[in-house]
């Protein structure tokens, strides 16, 4: 009985097996373009941030709430690109919620090329809605510069998520 069913419907079942993955292709190509940088730094650009004599463009990789990453907690991905004139001068760039106490606590480091760097920032569940995102840049000459931007400007989706979580306003 099963053999008869297979012989009768095998063509239709095989065509269906070929067509089902085609439904996922648009999302695949959109993600591939995002990770390649064809669609910009990320889904949502936060803008240009002046950090001392240098500047960088900051963007959220995905315009969504932070994702739970196991024991590490909730994480949010940011991308950045250094300005043309400062690419050779900047040694490291760090990102953190709240003002860093020192360079040792500067936050998560951006990795990648100066044209497209990425960082996974931990987002504590009790972060205040008026928190600031601090960017620390260290030069090859030892110079260190810091700047901040409101988290609400850098990631409105994170602020919305924090208010749903019960973060303090």
Identify the meaning behind each predicted range.
Residues 62-64, 111-114, 150-155:
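A short, sequence-level motif marking secondary-structure junctions
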């Amino acid at each position: 009985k099963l053999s008869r069913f297979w012989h009768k419907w095998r063509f239709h079942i095989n065509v269906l097996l070929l067509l089902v993955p085609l439904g996922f292709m648009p999302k695949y190509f959109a993600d591939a373009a995002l990770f390649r940088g064809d669609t910009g730094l990320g889904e949502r650009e936060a803008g240009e941030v002046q950090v001392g004599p240098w500047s960088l463009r900051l963007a959220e990789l995905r315009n969504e709430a932070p994702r739970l990453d196991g024991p590490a907690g909730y994480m949010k991905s940011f991308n950045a690109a250094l300005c043309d004139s400062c690419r050779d001068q900047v040694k490291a760039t760090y990102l953190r919620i709240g003002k860093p106490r020192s360079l040792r606590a500067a936050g998560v480091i951006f990795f990648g090329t100066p044209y497209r760097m990425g960082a996974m920032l931990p987002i504590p569940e009790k972060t205040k809605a008026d928190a600031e995102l601090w960017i620390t840049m260290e030069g090859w000459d030892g110079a260190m510069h810091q700047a901040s931007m409101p988290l609400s400007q850098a990631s409105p989706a994170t602020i919305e998520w924090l208010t749903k979580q019960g973060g303090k306003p």
